[in-house]
């Protein structure tokens, strides 16, 4: 630190604190404001759009500030932009000398406990990344709810997919050596923090983790949170070890293409979650959203979820539960705030209100008379002792502040009641004293007042000052423009007694509040279990209600890789337009080549299939009259046109990257959906690539696939392969316009109707007429169409195609950044590749 002696003691205090929090914006408490100085002030003033001014502190320094009572709004804005905030509070009473101050909390995008700043229906995860000989380890937690998870053995691709899907707000790394990951986190706007302590200190949270490398990986995150947040994190639950293989793989691109939780256009009504989330609580909504992005592969677990949906179809008790749940507060985050000592009395009132509903909640669950629901209900505790404590002690409408009284009910504590009685009688005494002084002095507008600087006083207007006589015993205390303020010995004695009792009452009330809070904290983990049950009930009620509203059916699951969907619908599209139902009947390893005009519904048909599959493997009923589905290990999509300007990738390049992902990682148990691959390049190139991809999937991967295209030449592949089937979306020409029937049938489309679609878009008539003329000429001359690639197919022997599993191993090797690896990293990676090689054998 440079010489700080030229600054005032207060500014020196600030600079010493800032040195320890160089990467954070320091909110420095001065009276009723948080002030920021130097570069913090310059940055914050721009982001917050507040005035940048100057402060004299031995030297002139840049300064800006925000009111203490409105700080949350400003903190939220900074957090949203990815900043860290160090909150500095006064920790000693004002007196002689400099008031002591210290950082009481570090708020970062991943370390938020305040419900006013957090998104209500989403988790707010912070994660850490470690590398072991088994691959990457991702630990993540939401400190507002106490949930903690850990995933082991991830590839770099799987790691980045999961980070995107979880929408991590902050990531903790042990070093900055992996440039690829750093660039990825930057692109995703994820705050990166560096921390190295992996020593196992909190054994409770890592107790479920058996292997040493997992305990250390989990400890990296927990140690960082405990050191940096300065919160009591006893509410964090033991790590839940997530087995990657139990979930269907959905990368971030698939989530985007299918618009499960986020819209491509920013329109929330185009997302699936908007139409299936009928939950009544924030807890249920968060659970539903999380499960939707983590579909299962376990048939037994999925069947149990379906059973729960059926169990909650009883209309009357379900409605009663809904009305109860609508009154339930966010118990999970309430418990988090109470446990982390970031609570106020209103949180305890909300906790009491929620607990008051549990006996009826339990009673209604019992009325379903269903063994599955009974099993859930048996775990519900009514917390009678805690409820009675809160009901007897906390006022129903307490203030937000916890140190200025008004929290504890009369009659709860005898000593507190005694202090309050003295203070109350003091108020009566003051009222009587004022009336007596008016009578004694003859000054009718005399009044008795109070302020924190001078205490109690008698105020007399300027015009009545001559009426003050010496025998009144008035001692001048303060001169105002229009009045004088006085005290008397009697008033001074009363002040000492009244203020003493009020001060003692406030301090005792704060002590009692803390005792009650500490008692509530002892129920933390039991309350978390209750919140999980409430969330599950809420989720199943929502899914049961949605199934009835939209006529969804329970899917059947098979291990035969057969698809039979009767009258399938897209659950979002049908909310906006009348939807034409379609069937999907697919054999194992079958490939559908789908042709038809633009706007005819090819992409919607493919999306419908994918969304129905995701819904089924999330444990939901699906939009169809019947559905028999395989359990997929992954869905790969390339649907719609997009580019990546920030990444320097064209539409065609993005197509190829996403196609490569599918061709590299798909298995025979995967579902691949490609929409018009190859359109972004020359016709020959695009057609050749499309045919090569279809053949590769058919011969090497053997996954089920839908491939929509305008290359009608590809439909000839069905003549050579039994498991390649042509489908088309029906459309008919009527005079000079097109009618799209949106029905998918066997066979191929005879043409693309591109000019007719252009006419529907109201292109100028001269353009349409010229296009029709040119098309006829091209068809007559045989130029530009019917490029038959099949005459060349023998030039590439099937045996020359690298087997899929070997290609996977080669991709791992090609992904290595040798320039960034240490010798130890190289040995770890070599061992990992060796294990992969043994698996392939």
Curated annotation (Swiss-Prot):
GO function terms (MF aspect): ATP binding; ATP-dependent DNA damage sensor activity; damaged DNA binding; mismatched DNA binding
Gene3D superfamilies tied to this protein: 1.10.1420.10, DNA repair protein MutS, domain I, MutS, connector domain, P-loop containing nucleotide triphosphate hydrolases
Pfam families: MutS_I, MutS_III, MutS_IV, MutS_V
HAMAP family: MutS (MF_00096)
Function: This protein is involved in the repair of mismatches in DNA. It is possible that it carries out the mismatch recognition step. This protein has a weak ATPase activity.
Coiled coil: none
Signal peptide region: none
Keywords: ATP-binding, DNA damage, DNA repair, DNA-binding, Nucleotide-binding
Encoding gene per record: mutS
Name of the protein described by the UniProt record: DNA mismatch repair protein MutS
Keyword DNA-binding annotated: yes
Gene Ontology cellular component annotations, sorted alphabetically: cytosol
PANTHER family per the UniProt record, alphabetical: DNA MISMATCH REPAIR PROTEIN MSH1, MITOCHONDRIAL, DNA MISMATCH REPAIR PROTEIN MUTS FAMILY MEMBER
One GO term of the biological process aspect: mismatch repair
Organism: Acholeplasma laidlawii (strain PG-8A)
Residues reported in the UniProt entry to bind ATP: 596-603
Transmembrane residue ranges: none
Domain of life: Bacteria
SUPFAM superfamilies, sorted: DNA repair protein MutS, domain I, DNA repair protein MutS, domain II, DNA repair protein MutS, domain III, P-loop containing nucleoside triphosphate hydrolases
InterPro entries recorded: DNA_mismatch_repair_MutS, DNA_mismatch_repair_MutS-lik_N, DNA_mismatch_repair_MutS/MSH, DNA_mismatch_repair_MutS_C, DNA_mismatch_repair_MutS_clamp, DNA_mismatch_repair_MutS_core, DNA_mismatch_repair_MutS_N, DNA_mismatch_repair_MutS_sf
Family that this chain belongs to: Belongs to the DNA mismatch repair MutS family.
């Amino acid at each position: 630190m440079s010489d700080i002696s030229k600054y005032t003691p207060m500014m020196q205090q600030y600079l010493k604190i800032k040195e320890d929090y160089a990467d954070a914006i320091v909110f420095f408490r001065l009276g009723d404001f948080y002030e920021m100085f130097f570069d913090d002030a310059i940055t914050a003033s721009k982001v917050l759009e507040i005035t940048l001014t100057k402060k004299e502190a031995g030297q002139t320094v840049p300064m800006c500030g925000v009111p203490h009572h409105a700080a949350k709004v400003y903190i939220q804005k900074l957090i949203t932009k990815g900043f860290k905030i160090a909150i500095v509070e006064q920790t000693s009473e004002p007196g002689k000398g400099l008031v002591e101050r210290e950082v009481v909390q570090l708020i970062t995008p991943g370390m938020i406990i305040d419900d006013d700043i957090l998104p209500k229906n989403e988790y707010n995860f912070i994660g850490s990344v470690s590398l072991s000989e088994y691959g990457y380890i991702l630990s993540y937690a939401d400190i507002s709810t106490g949930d903690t998870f850990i995933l082991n053995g991830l590839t770099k691709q799987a790691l980045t997919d999961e980070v995107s899907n979880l929408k991590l707000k902050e990531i903790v790394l042990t070093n900055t050596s992996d440039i690829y990951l750093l660039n990825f986190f930057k692109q995703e706007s994820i705050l990166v923090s560096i921390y190295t302590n992996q020593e196992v200190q909190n054994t409770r949270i890592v107790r479920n983790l058996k292997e040493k490398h997992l305990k250390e990986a989990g400890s990296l995150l927990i140690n960082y949170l405990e050191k940096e947040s300065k919160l009591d994190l006893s509410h964090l639950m033991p790590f839940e070890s997530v087995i990657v293989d139990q979930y269907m793989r959905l990368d971030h691109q698939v989530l985007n293409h299918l618009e499960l939780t986020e819209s491509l256009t920013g329109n929330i009504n185009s997302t699936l979650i908007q139409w299936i989330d009928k939950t009544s609580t924030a807890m249920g909504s968060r659970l539903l959203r999380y499960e939707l992005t983590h579909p299962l592969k376990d048939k037994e677990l999925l069947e149990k979820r379906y059973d729960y949906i059926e169990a909650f179809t009883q209309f009357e008790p379900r409605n009663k539960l809904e009305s109860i749940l609508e009154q339930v507060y966010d118990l999970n985050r309430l418990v988090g705030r109470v446990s982390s000592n970031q609570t106020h009395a209103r949180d305890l009132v909300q906790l009491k209100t929620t607990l008051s509903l549990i006996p009826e909640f339990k009673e209604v669950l019992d009325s379903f008379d269903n063994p599955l629901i009974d099993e859930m209900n048996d775990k519900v505790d009514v917390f009678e002792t805690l409820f009675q404590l809160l009901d007897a002690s906390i006022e129903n409408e307490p203030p937000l502040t916890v140190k200025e009284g008004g929290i504890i009910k009369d009659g709860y504590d005898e000593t507190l009641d005694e202090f309050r009685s003295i203070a109350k009688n003091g108020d009566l005494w003051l009222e009587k004293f004022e009336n007596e002084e008016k009578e004694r002095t003859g000054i009718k507008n005399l009044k008795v007042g109070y302020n924190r600087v001078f205490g109690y006083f008698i105020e007399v207007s300027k015009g009545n000052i001559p009426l003050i006589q010496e025998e009144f015993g008035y001692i001048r205390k303060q001169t105002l423009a229009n009045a004088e303020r006085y005290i008397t010995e009697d008033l001074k004695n009363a002040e000492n007694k009244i203020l003493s009792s009020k001060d003692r009452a406030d301090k005792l009330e704060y002590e009692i509040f803390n005792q009650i809070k500490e008692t509530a904290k002892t129920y933390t983990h039991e309350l978390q279990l209750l919140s999980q049950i409430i969330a599950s009930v809420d989720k199943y009620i929502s899914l049961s209600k949605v199934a009835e509203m939209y006529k969804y059916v329970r899917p059947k699951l098979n291990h035969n890789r057969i698809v039979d969907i009767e009258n399938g619908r897209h659950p979002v599209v049908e909310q906006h337009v009348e939807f034409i139902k379609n069937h999907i009947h697919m054999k194992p390893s079958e490939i559908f080549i789908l042709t038809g005009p633009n706007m005819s519904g090819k992409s919607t048909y493919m999306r419908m299939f994918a969304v129905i599959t995701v819904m089924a493997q999330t444990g939901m009923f699906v939009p169809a009259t019947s559905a028999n589905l395989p359990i997929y290990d992954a869905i790969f999509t390339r649907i719609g046109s997009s580019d990546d300007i920030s990444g320097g990738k064209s539409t065609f390049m993005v197509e190829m990257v996403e196609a490569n992902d599918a061709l590299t990682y798909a298995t025979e148990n995967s579902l691949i959906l490609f929409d018009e691959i190859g359109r972004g390049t020359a016709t020959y190139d695009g057609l050749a690539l499309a045919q090569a991809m279809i053949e590769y999937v058919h011969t090497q991967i053997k996954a089920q696939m839908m491939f929509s295209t305008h290359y009608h030449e590809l439909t000839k592949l069905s003549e050579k392969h039994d498991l390649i089937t042509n489908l088309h979306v029906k459309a008919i020409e009527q005079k000079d316009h097109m009618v799209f029937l949106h029905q998918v049938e066997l066979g191929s489309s005879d043409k693309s109707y591109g000019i007719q679609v252009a006419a529907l878009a109201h292109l100028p008539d001269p353009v349409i007429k010229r296009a029709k003329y040119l098309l006829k000429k091209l068809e007559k001359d045989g130029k530009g169409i019917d490029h038959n690639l099949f005459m060349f197919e023998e030039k590439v022997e099937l045996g020359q195609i690298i087997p899929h599993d070997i290609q996977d191993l080669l991709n791992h090797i090609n992904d290595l950044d040798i320039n960034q690896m240490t010798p130890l990293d190289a040995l770890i990676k070599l061992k990992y590749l060796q294990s992969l090689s043994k698996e392939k054998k």
